[in-house]
């Protein structure tokens, strides 16, 4: 039976406030990591963000934290090959994984990134959820399927976040939602709820904050 994968509902006032308070605290860049030996101590809960280059990952992290320049997008897709750690309040790490789907990156660079990603996803006990960002204009592409399968094999629960929802009309968005739901039905690690966001308009940002805050 195919799961319905409903869109996340607006949180209640209590959850909204919890989310607001978490992201109202200090949010700082901690470090960029290129090897497992460089990971910060696992003394906080972690959520990570994955997505194709140019899917709007940096914009989403900046919108969540209310810090415009916190996460910076590289001018060249796939240029940044680091796992970037940011604090959220006193209790969480936000982890920005390198963008994938970059056709021009050298093969050794891609292979090194893939090895590091597999090691991180499989070996980080404090990782509570991966948020996989999908462009609301395009849906799940083949390169997204690769990361979703990797999350399945690492047994890391992931939740799809649709980005740039303000760039597509509602009728077209519904078609994309159907395509995403069909794609996710094949992935056992998929959390059965979608989040629709627009960093530019602020859509879905309080909802995503609340989801992150409620993870334990």
Curated annotation (Swiss-Prot):
Keywords (A to Z) from UniProt: Cell cycle, Cell division, GTP-binding, Magnesium, Metal-binding, Nucleotide-binding, Septation
GO biological process, one term: division septum assembly
Cited Pfam families: MMR_HSR1 (PF01926)
Domain EngB-type G: 43-216
Assigned GO CC terms: cytosol
Disulfide bond residue pairs: none
The organism's place on the tree of life at top rank: Bacteria
Annotated positions binding Mg(2+): 58, 80
Keyword hit for Iron: no
GO molecular-function term, one example from the UniProt record: metal ion binding
InterPro entries registered for this protein in UniProt: G_ENGB_dom, GTP-bd, GTP-bd_ribosome_bio_YsxC, P-loop_NTPase
Chain residues that bind GTP: 51-58, 78-82, 96-99, 163-166, 197-199
Cofactor: Mg(2+)
Function noted in UniProt: Necessary for normal cell division and for the maintenance of normal septation.
Family from the record: Belongs to the TRAFAC class TrmE-Era-EngA-EngB-Septin-like GTPase superfamily. EngB GTPase family.
Protein name, per record: Probable GTP-binding protein EngB
Organism: Roseobacter denitrificans (strain ATCC 33942 / OCh 114)
